[in-house]
């Protein structure tokens, strides 16, 4: 017997839409555009909703009787509703045992339905708070990750600086050129108020030739240093 085929609990992805969103189609602008936003009303779970409706609609607007006052403690009311559901469920079991065909059975079912609606409504009123809390936790995680990244970068930077300092300390003292010759000289820019272009060009050529000589001297010193390092056992 072959292995049993695993069936996914979710429906398969819509391949007729996925194949249209290739990289080539997106780059060429051939991918289908998203549907326009809904402006009036829409259907969801068999019910019609308006776009300007509140996310959490009041119970009265849905034709449902309110069992708790306008000002209340959510935790306290949820505990009371939970206890009421348990008591009504036990009453329903007692009715089913004593008189299954009694009309009280339907009344008790309606009471349980109303209690569950209130429980879900109070839980949904916590959704904005849950969204804010989720966003806060996400931002804290991002902050911690960035701080850890910055700390790792600082450690690597300190390690690189230490390696460079060790390399500089291990350089031999008998270099062909002095340390001052190895440094990059920074001099203030010469300003010439004259408008003689020929003099300026000659000065630029002299400066460029001087810089080229400095670069050649530094390259020679570096080559000598590398040769000495290779000759060491």
From Swiss-Prot:
The keyword Transcription applies. It comes from Bos taurus. Residues 185-213 are annotated as: Disordered. One of its GO terms (molecular function) is transcription coregulator activity. Residues 203-213 have a biased composition (Basic and acidic residues). Keywords: Activator, Isopeptide bond, Nucleus, Phosphoprotein, Transcription, Transcription regulation, Ubl conjugation. The modification Phosphoserine is found at residue 194. Belongs to the Mediator complex subunit 7 family. It is found in: Nucleus. This is Mediator of RNA polymerase II transcription subunit 7.
